[in-house]
């Protein structure tokens, strides 16, 4: 979001998460011309409740509140039903995650008629990924045939929960996740050091050199075979460090 704000020379304020990676409704009770946040959060994977979202909406009746639900299909409760109650809510979702359609750059925005009409007014000026006919048709088929997507999501969720358990057994701190990744750190290993060691072995995870999260790694949930290779590396690495 800051990238686009900078691109269009918009003033903005980032809401800083607390030590537990949580947002607070009070953070949004200040003058603004719009609000956007991801739910589940990236990169933490944490989820805020529908009650939280409703409080933000009620506190900002004159502002559009955009909830980015890129990862919502991996265990979260969507706030889409709230668009019928709150005219200032817009929910955006992508086909790049749960529907495995990343190359198409396809997404949807859901809101009341007036809010969406304003998007139509400006979309050709700001949307750098116009949707071609073939992409539209594939997207429609994907929505009408969601069973395969749901089954894949359940598989990811099952592997994610196993991954959380396994990492905790290895001594990692693992916050709850409602996405297709986990956000982890080891209290006795530097985050960047572990990131580089994994990369050297061809295991790619994400690391950010930013305050509060610089000791954490974001690990995407892969196939069972990929995750077992990841666990095997960690066990060997921790053994070498004398931490197992």
Please report, for each region that a protein language model flagged, where it lies by residue.
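Conserved PLP-binding catalytic core of the aspartate aminotransferase-like
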Residues: 157, 169-201, 217
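Substrate-binding/gating loop at the entrance of the active-site cleft, primarily
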Residues: 1-10
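PLP-dependent aminotransferase class I/II
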Residues: 88-168, 172-175
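Short acidic/glycine-enriched loop/turn segments that link adjacent beta-strands
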Residues: 103, 178, 212-215
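Active-site phosphate-binding strand-loop segment of PLP-dependent enzymes
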Residues: 13-73
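Short beta->alpha connector loops at strand-helix junctions that form conserved
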Residues: 14-19, 93, 208-209
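PLP-dependent enzyme catalytic core of the Aspartate aminotransferase-like
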Residues: 51, 197-201, 210-244
């Amino acid at each position: 979001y800051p990238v686009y704000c900078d691109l269009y020379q918009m003033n903005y304020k980032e809401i800083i998460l607390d030590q537990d990676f949580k947002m607070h409704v009070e953070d949004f009770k200040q003058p603004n011309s719009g609000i956007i946040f991801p739910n589940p959060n990236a990169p933490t994977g944490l989820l805020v409740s529908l009650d939280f979202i409703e409080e933000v909406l009620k506190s900002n009746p004159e502002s559009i509140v955009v909830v980015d639900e890129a990862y919502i299909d991996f265990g979260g409760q969507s706030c889409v039903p709230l668009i019928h109650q709150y005219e200032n809510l817009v929910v955006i979702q992508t086909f790049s995650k749960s529907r495995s359609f990343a190359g198409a750059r396809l997404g949807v925005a859901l809101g009341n008629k007036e809010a969406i009409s304003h998007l139509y007014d400006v979309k050709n000026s700001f949307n750098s990924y116009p949707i071609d006919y073939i992409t539209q048709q594939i997207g429609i088929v994907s929505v009408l045939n969601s069973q395969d997507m749901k089954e894949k999501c359940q598989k990811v969720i099952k592997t994610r929960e196993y991954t959380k358990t396994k990492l905790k057994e290895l001594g990692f701190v693992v916050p709850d996740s409602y996405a297709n990744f986990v956000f982890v750190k080891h209290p006795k290993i530097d985050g960047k050091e572990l990131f580089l060691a994994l990369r050297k072995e061809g295991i790619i995870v994400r690391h950010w050199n930013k305050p509060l999260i610089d000791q954490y790694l974001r690990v995407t949930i892969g196939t069972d075979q990929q995750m077992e290779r990841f666990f095997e590396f960690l066990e060997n690495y921790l053994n070498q460090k004398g931490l197992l």
